[in-house]
Amino acid sequence: MQTPKREFLDHAMTERVCRRVEAGRGERNRRWLACWLGILLPFAWLWFCLIDNLSVEWASNPQYGYGWVVPVLCVGLICRRWNTLRAASSSGLDGRRPLSGKGGMVIVGAFILLALLYLPTRLIEGATPEWRIIQWSLGFETVGLTLCAIYLACGPLCLKRCLFPICFILIAIPWPTLIEAPVIQSLTRVNSRVVIELLSWLGIPAVQHGNLIEVNTGTIGIDEACSGMRSFQTSLMISLFFGEFYDMGRLRRLLLVPAGFILAMLLNVCRMSFLSIVAAKKGVAAIAQYHDPAGIMITLACTAGLWGLAALFNHGRIPAPGFLSPVEGRNEEVKNSKLRLPLLRRLGFALLLWLATVDAGAELWYRSLESHLAPGPKWSVVFPADNPTFKIVPISADTKNLLRFDEGKQGAWIDSDGSRWQAFYFNWRPGRVAGYLAKRHTPEICLPATGRELLSGPKLTLMNVKDVALPMRSYVFGTEGGPIYVFQCRWEGGAARNAYVEEESSRFNLIRGIWAGRGKKGQKVLEIVIARVNRPEQAEAAVARQLEKLVVVEEQ
């Protein structure tokens, strides 16, 4: 029998041992947390930069508004596969070091290459964040680095299971303009043509002008956000998601995509036909009442239809065999984690240091560059209100929502020589999205949608009006009533004269923005359309004379 003193000593010793164990456990937990923070933090920053870049497009362009749900769906797909991912991570390396064999070395080489490519991507993105090629580059780098890390951490089996959920974010990146523009025009024209036929069967007279439909009460503008392109992209996203959600085979997934596209096109034709009938019966202004509800209805109907179709395709399918259960692979997972963590920790901290250096360097570069840029003259546009033929043309709500300018106006008038004029003026105050929104639409994209044919242009002419350098790009479009001449100026505050280069939107000249600044000092767009003029030279001379009257320079 132990004495009270012995019992007291044993109890005190037990308490000291417990405190030491708890202290050691707390220290290990802190080290474990610091280790994984160092590994995960650079990838969290990469994904934040990608979503932050794309969020401007998602918020300002209805065509890509579905992008907001894509990151959520990516996380949902990963959570759905969580148990199989844990089992795959414990069995994927088979006890070997991640760098054993050529495959591991290739992955590490790809990891280093993608990390190095982040430097030019981030530098160019600072000047032209709206450039689709840069958005895709940032997307591939983010996805590629994440997949490389998953392979090194968990092995090839886990990489295979994570491949689709991680790559699914690419569906939310805007398509390159060279692909997007012709697809938009083609799908919208097909939709409009089908609607015209349906209206004729219903006894409603209608005429197609490019992407526009003219009925007896006016012209219906079927803009890009309401075209088949939006329906196609949304249906593609939904089809791919349900194919992965139900873990379908390749054939079923390939069948689901065109089936979704056909369903989306049919629903979009129904929507356009409904809006056209409303316009013919109640007037074009009545469309605003049904525009958004009709769009929401076809999106919900498309989602429900594809969900049902995916469930039908998956009916009676035998699930594919899974991986080891988490319990069976737990011991192997502990052994492999000891081999992976040192490598992942080194790569994670190296990547974190590299990303911080690149982003800090890019910010310092642009701040230093912009500190030497002059703000430029303050000018605005005053329309010829004293002309008896002048009238203010209201700006549609869709245009306001799409361009989101701070100041905008448009007007039309007839000059003394009989030429017809129409002018648009938009102003964006200094800010992050000023350059982004000002560069969005150009005449060669918008006017063909209204049935005009581009005959020539763009041709750059630098016009000096009251000591203000205006980079005018001229176009000639063919119409049923003869050619029209379009002059568009996108003026950027603080930009030097040599910053205005011909074919500014081309993929190579956009790199010049690295030396021109980020375009955050404000943007102005002035567009002038002239009709009933015989020659381009005559139109250019008339614009030069008219600009002297329209442009007003404020005293500084």
Give names to the regions the model predicted.
Residues 2-556:
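Hydrophobic N-terminal alpha-helices or hydrophobic patches in metabolic proteins across all domains
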